[in-house]
Structure formats: structure tokens, C-alpha cells
Design a protein with these regions (language model features):
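Short loop/turn segments that flank or connect secondary-structure elements
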Residues: 1-165
Length: 165
């Protein structure tokens, strides 16, 4: 059994350090070390050895993925549903025209914080919190936003600062 994560604690830390994080990531964008991708991947792996997502699942409880057509097709097929039926049951279109869940938390999140469609989950879920992508400095605003929701994203930025500054 994994140790429960104090989501509010990490949220408060992220709020307190938001300006510092923004400045650090902004500087990183201006002058990134040549081996940044390697450093970032190592830190990503280190963070996810410490953080068990199933002890948190805050992303699944509070952030909804933006569904792409490939996601909808894959998940509807998994449930043996026609696309319109899947969309009618689970999705709505937001003010930006994106397809998102009708309700949160995620309807596929179990009481044990496990995803019931893990193998076919949306791309946005698969890639969250995006800390293992190359050229991390290209998504600074998203990274800052993710630190407010995801303890692993917060730790990633903190460890990256320690390593680079």
C-alpha cells in the first residue's frame, strides 16, 4: 500500500514558489544547458521513484483531459460503443471547442485511485505531467500550472532547480 500524498501541502508549496519557478523556467528557456533533456529525464525518473501516482490521483480528480479523436475512437472501441454513444455518455464540448468529460472526477477512476481504462487512456493522461518530454522549457506555463495540481511536477521543478542553479 502506498503512502497517501498530502495534495494540499504540495499545492501550497507550489503557490508559494510560483514566481521563483516561473523565473527559473524562464531563465532555462533563455539559456538551457546542452544536456538539459538528459538531466530532465533523470530527474523525472527519480521523482516517479518517490511519488506513486495512485497515492494521489489528483489529476484524475481535478483535471480533465482534452480528448482527441484518436482517444475517443480507441476508448469507445474498448467499451464496444459507437462513437456518438460514447460521446453522449461521457463527453461535452467546452468553451474552447475541446471535448472534455461531462463530470469530474474522471468516471474511469476507481475508488482505489486506479484507472479502469489504463491501457487505452487518453494521450493527455498518458503524458501528464509532461516532465519527461524533450525541451521542457517549451512548456513553461503548462509546467507551472501542473505544479499546482501534481506533487510530482512540483518536485520535478524543485529538483531541476537544485541540479541546474
Amino acid at each position: 500500500m502506498s503512502k497517501e500524498i498530502d495534495i494540499e501541502y504540495y499545492h501550497q508549496l507550489a503557490l508559494q514558489k510560483k514566481k521563483e519557478h516561473r523565473k527559473f523556467l524562464g531563465n532555462l528557456k533563455k539559456k538551457a544547458p546542452k544536456n538539459l533533456d538528459k538531466i530532465a529525464l533523470e530527474i523525472h525518473q527519480e521523482v516517479f521513484e518517490e511519488i506513486d501516482c495512485t497515492a494521489c490521483a489528483n489529476c484524475c480528480k481535478s483535471l480533465g483531459p482534452d480528448f482527441k479523436e484518436a482517444d475517443i475512437t480507441r476508448i469507445a472501441k474498448y467499451f464496444k460503443m459507437k462513437l456518438p454513444a460514447f460521446e453522449d455518455e461521457f463527453l461535452q464540448v467546452d468553451e474552447d471547442g475541446d471535448k472534455i468529460f461531462k463530470t469530474m472526477p474522471c468516471p474511469f477512476l476507481g475508488g482505489d485511485n486506479l484507472c479502469s481504462i489504463y491501457d487505452v487512456r487518453p494521450k493527455a493522461c498518458r503524458e501528464f505531467p509532461h516532465t519527461d518530454r524533450k525541451k521542457i522549457y517549451q512548456i513553461n506555463n503548462l509546467t507551472i500550472k501542473n505544479t499546482l495540481t501534481c506533487p510530482a511536477a512540483y518536485l520535478f521543478v524543485e529538483k531541476l532547480r537544485e541540479k541546474i542553479e
